[in-house]
Amino acid sequence: EQYELEVTEQEITIYGADARSFIYALNYLSETYLGVLPFWFWNDQKMEVKSYVEIPCGTYHSEADRIRYRGWFINDEVLISHWTAGVSKDYPWEMVFEALLRCGGNLVIPGTDKNSRIYAPIASDMGLMITHHHAEPLGAEMFLRAYPDLEPSYLKHKDLFEGLWKDAIGRQKDEEVIWNIGFRGQGDVPFWENDSAFDTSEKRGELISNIMKKQYAMVREQIPDAVFCTNLYGEILELYREGCLQIPEDVILIWADNGYGKMVSRRQGNHNPRVSAVPGGG
């Protein structure tokens, strides 16, 4: 993703290893010499028309980023889902993705449920890698969206769950994806809220661990060099801290705050254990 600029009196030449290299180079020129800020749209920046811009001759090398995958998730996306900003429903999302690129980001969760199907191709076309919400492993369609009349039980409908995962892999296998693995209940809750058979941490962790291994293997079968992540969020963090989860060694662990900036597990109803969400337990 690094780039090199060569500036002479006649021209500017950009060298880059991939598409994002050129995007970052153009954004650097845009901000440094035209004054366009990363959040220009969100801050209502007033643009200044320039008749002349002087860019010094010479060579500029960008620095390598210290963090390989850098991005964000658009939480509470319903707040912009029906906003057009006077242009179109897609436009605010395009501005979200542009701001991320201008900040040096390269990875995004482009919405959830129906939104993820709509905006993932746009984010990808704009140069971003895609990953998935923790309630939608592999970016698969929610079970109750696909099968609204069935009980969303993995034990009862294993083949249907795995069919949704297979479809998601096939749909995205040619894109740049960081594959999120895991298992939560429908509606973004612990899966055992609707299945009393899983009444201990050991039983819950065993099922989630087995599912993650299955998802991992399904992706690896089609994409040998795939990159994976999982979210240590809520009940998943608790199970991990208790030693009840077995996660493949090369899966990136995403440590989540509680939604209020504290690195502890998020409260769910009256359950608020405040388990540390700092790597190493600090």
What role is predicted for each listed range?
Residues 22-25, 81-83, 140-141, 191, ...:
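Short helix/loop capping segments that flank catalytic or ligand/cofactor-binding pockets
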Residues 1-64:
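Contiguous, structured surface segment used for ligand recognition
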Residues 37-107:
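An acidic-aromatic substrate-binding cleft motif
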Residues 47-49, 53-55, 117-120, 124-125, ...:
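Gly/Pro-rich turn-and-neighbor structural signature
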Residues 13-16, 75-90, 103-111, 144-162, ...:
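The substrate-binding groove and active-site-proximal loops of carbohydrate-active enzymes
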Residues 12-14, 70-74, 107-109, 130-132, ...:
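Structural recognition of the beta-strand scaffold that forms the well-ordered cores
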Residues 101, 106-111, 134, 257-259, ...:
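Structured mid-domain segments that build the active-site/substrate or prosthetic-cofactor binding neighborhood
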Residues 88-118, 122-125, 129-131, 174:
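Catalytic domains of carbohydrate-active enzymes, especially glycoside hydrolases
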